Amino acid sequence: MGSELESAMETLINVFHAHSGQEGDKYKLSKKELKDLLQTELSGFLDVQKDADAVDKVMKELDENGDGEVDFKEYVVLVAALTVACNNFFWETS
């Protein structure tokens, strides 16, 4: 078994691929696939968002190349940004 960080990396990869490719390119998330991923894996994030257009806004910000889909690199940017925000929140409140 690998380290905690290796396990976390494997989980990031597995979660992405569990949701990608259901509507097309298996290496990208469509808007629907991204929404499903967020609802399944980051439901707390969506619960905090009171904005009904939150997924649209996340998609627009992540989709750096403007192809209407989120590739693995763009997905990792989302996870990294949320991780930084969580780190700041928990360390500032402790």
From Swiss-Prot:
Small calcium binding protein that plays important roles in several biological processes such as Ca(2+) homeostasis, chondrocyte biology and cardiomyocyte regulation. In response to an increase in intracellular Ca(2+) levels, binds calcium which triggers conformational changes. These changes allow interactions with specific target proteins and modulate their activity. Ca(2+) 1 binds at K28, E33. SMART domains: EFh, S_100. CDD domains: S-100A1. This is Protein S100-A1. Able to bind zinc in vitro; the binding sites are different from the calcium binding sites. The physiological relevance of zinc binding is unclear. Physiological concentrations of potassium antagonize the binding of both divalent cations, especially affecting the high-affinity calcium-binding sites. The modification S-nitrosocysteine is found at C86. Gene3D superfamilies: EF-hand. Dimer of either two alpha chains, or two beta chains, or one alpha and one beta chain. Also forms heterodimers with S100P. Interacts with AGER. Interacts with CAPZA1. Interacts with FKBP4. Interacts with RYR1 and RYR2. Interacts with CACYBP in a calcium-dependent manner. Interacts with PPP5C (via TPR repeats); the interaction is calcium-dependent and modulates PPP5C activity. Interacts with ATP2A2 and PLN in a Ca(2+)-dependent manner. Interacts with mitochondrial F1-ATPase subunits ATP5F1A and ATP5F1B; these interactions increase F1-ATPase activity. One of its GO terms (molecular function) is calcium ion binding. The lineage of its organism: Eukaryota, Metazoa, Chordata, Craniata, Vertebrata. Keywords: Calcium, Cytoplasm, Metal-binding, Mitochondrion, Repeat, S-nitrosylation, Sarcoplasmic reticulum. Pfam families: EF-hand_1 (PF00036), S_100 (PF01023). Disruption phenotype: Deficient mice show unaltered baseline cardiac function and heart rate, but display deficiencies in their contractile function in response to beta-adrenergic stimulation and enhanced transsarcolemmal Ca(2+) influx. It also significantly accelerates the development of contractile dysfunction after myocardial infarction, with a rapid onset of cardiac remodeling and a transition to heart failure combined with excessive mortality.
